Amino acid sequence: MGNIRQTFIKRVARELFDRYPDQFTKDFEHNKKKVGELTNVTSKTIRNRIAGYITRLVRMKEEGKML
């Protein structure tokens, strides 16, 4: 079974991915730094979850599974 992410995390991740698609890669550590720069999220846990979901979105886009 997979993890179900909160709507807040999905919304913020999709907004960032739509605004800055060229700044994110398949590397989680890189995405984590970019999320920290582009948002005002102070919680490390929330930042990591957003970065993880963005990493997943990048992979889905490269595989052609994203709408």
From Swiss-Prot:
This is Small ribosomal subunit protein eS17. Belongs to the eukaryotic ribosomal protein eS17 family. It comes from Thermococcus onnurineus (strain NA1). Keywords: Ribonucleoprotein, Ribosomal protein. GO terms for molecular function: structural constituent of ribosome. Signal peptide: none annotated. SUPFAM superfamilies: Rps17e-like. One of its GO terms (biological process) is translation. InterPro entries: Ribosomal_eS17, Ribosomal_eS17_CS, Ribosomal_eS17_sf. One of its GO terms (cellular component) is cytosol. Transmembrane segments: none annotated.
